[in-house]
A protein has these predicted regions:
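N-proximal low-complexity "stem/linker" segments adjacent to membrane-targeting elements
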Residues: 1-30
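Conserved donor nucleotide-binding strand/loop of the catalytic core
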Residues: 39, 53-88
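Acidic donor-diphosphate engagement hotspot in glycosyltransferases and nucleotidyltransferases
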Residues: 24, 52, 82, 106-108, ...
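Donor nucleotide-sugar binding loop of glycosyltransferases
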Residues: 17-21, 48, 78
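A conserved acidic beta->alpha catalytic loop
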Residues: 45-54, 101
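Acceptor/aglycone-binding surface of glycosyltransferases and processive sugar-polymer synthases
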Residues: 72-88, 93-96, 102-181, 208-224, ...
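Short loop->beta transition adjacent to catalytic acidic/histidine clusters or analogous donor-positioning motifs
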Residues: 6-8, 29-42, 51, 65-68
């Protein structure tokens, strides 16, 4: 059995995930005690129009010492939800998956095990061993990975894999501008620029069984393209200024 980490903040973004939310929180409550001695679970409701907000509040009320809910009044975007989750986290290690249950909470143990390796990485990112997504999303992902490699030198295998683990200290002082799907890439680009080490580990990926995916919507893709080129042009114009743009990821801990 992998040695447990002392304290872990786990969060997930959720937009119209009423069919997945309760099951994911119950899965986390059952699984995280084997991964961390102390943990918290944060549900980030990104302006959902279904019962996601109400269910998140019910779960927080039922487990007040462990579960918290963060709400966006409107749908601000995937990156904005990740930023809110990172900002709400209180512990030294911070992990997230998506709210669609295409990753299992137990697989965070693969990431914590890698974090404890001799090279002591600052960040561990998962890569999907075999994607369980429609073909169009797989095509988008391959093109996106190639573009990030060419224009930013980002060599991570699976930039947008929603299974990541951070040492909180690695995020201190970082700012990310994108509030959309480009958030993860921008974060990894700025972590590398800050000299932080990133390790990778393969994780299983499971088919979505409830709810609807929004990652391939034209509006989401166009926003990511816009943010991609905005950062690239700013880095060419003034690298140091570009790296300082955006909103801070962390808030002072209470």
């Amino acid at each position: 059995m992998t040695e447990r980490v002392p304290r872990l903040s786990y969060f997930f973004p959720a937009h119209n995930e009423e069919a997945n939310l309760a099951g994911l929180v119950e899965e986390a409550l059952a699984t995280l005690p084997s991964i961390a001695e102390t943990f918290e679970i944060i549900a980030v409701n990104d302006g959902s129009r279904d019962r996601t907000a109400a269910i998140a509040d019910e779960l927080a009320a039922a487990h007040p010492d462990v579960v918290r809910a963060v709400h966006h009044p409107t749908n601000l975007g995937y990156g904005a939800a990740l930023r809110s989750g990172l900002g709400a986290a209180r512990y030294e290690l911070v992990a997230f998956t998506d709210g669609d249950r295409q990753f299992q909470v137990a697989d965070l143990g693969r990431l914590t095990e890698r974090l404890g390796a001799a090279d002591h990485p600052d960040v561990v990112v998962g890569f999907r061993i075999k994607r369980a997504d429609p073909p169009i999303r797989t095509i988008y992902a391959r093109l996106y990975r190639l573009a990030n490699r060419i224009f930013f030198g980002l060599t991570v295998t699976d930039v947008d894999c929603a299974c990541k683990l951070f040492r909180r200290e690695a995020l201190e002082g970082l700012r990310v501008e994108s509030g959309g799907a480009f958030f993860s890439a921008e974060l990894l680009i700025k972590l590398r620029a800050a000299g932080r080490s990133v390790a990778e580990v393969g994780v299983p990926h499971y088919p979505r069984t409830a709810g609807s995916a929004t990652g391939a919507k034209p509006s989401v893709v166009l926003r990511a393209v816009r943010d991609f080129w905005a950062l690239r042009l700013r880095l060419w114009a003034n690298r140091s200024r570009a790296l300082r743009r955006g909103q801070a990821l962390l808030r002072p801990r209470p």
